[in-house]
Amino acid sequence: MKIRPLHDRVIVKRKEIEAKSAGGIVLTGSAAGKSTRGEVLAVGRGRILENGEVKALDVKVGDIVIFNDGYGVKVEKIDNDEVLIMSESDILAIVEK
């Protein structure tokens, strides 16, 4: 199945990150909490401004992004990956390499 986001929506695949406690113990499962990083899989055309113009999004396919846990709408697994649909404004930062 292929999903194409509309307007300023972005499709993000959660990326698992290794969580460690303050003492250096690797946390797993619910102790680690939900990842707030993900890879952008698809982007919409852009945000429609009040004057009708379309403002292109700052994020692009392949970007690794940071977002608040709880943002976005969880979609059934696509190609065995849990994906989220969210507005670009829900994304806090792009991780630069």
Swiss-Prot record:
Gene Ontology biological process: chaperone cofactor-dependent protein refolding
InterPro entries xref list: Chaperonin_GroES (IPR020818), Chaperonin_GroES_sf (IPR037124), Chaprnonin_Cpn10_CS (IPR018369), GroES-like_sf (IPR011032)
PROSITE patterns linked to this entry: CHAPERONINS_CPN10
Matches recorded under SMART domains: Cpn10
GO MF, one example: unfolded protein binding
Cellular localization per UniProt: Cytoplasm
UniProt keyword Chaperone, yes or no: yes
GO terms under cellular component: cytoplasm
Entry keywords, A to Z: Chaperone, Cytoplasm
A Pfam family reported for this protein in Swiss-Prot or TrEMBL: Cpn10
The keyword Cytoplasm appears for this protein: yes
Subunit structure: Heptamer of 7 subunits arranged in a ring. Interacts with the chaperonin GroEL.
Entry similarity comment: Belongs to the GroES chaperonin family.
Function in brief: Together with the chaperonin GroEL, plays an essential role in assisting protein folding. The GroEL-GroES system forms a nano-cage that allows encapsulation of the non-native substrate proteins and provides a physical environment optimized to promote and accelerate protein folding. GroES binds to the apical surface of the GroEL ring, thereby capping the opening of the GroEL channel.
Designated name of the protein: Co-chaperonin GroES
Organism: Sodalis glossinidius (strain morsitans)
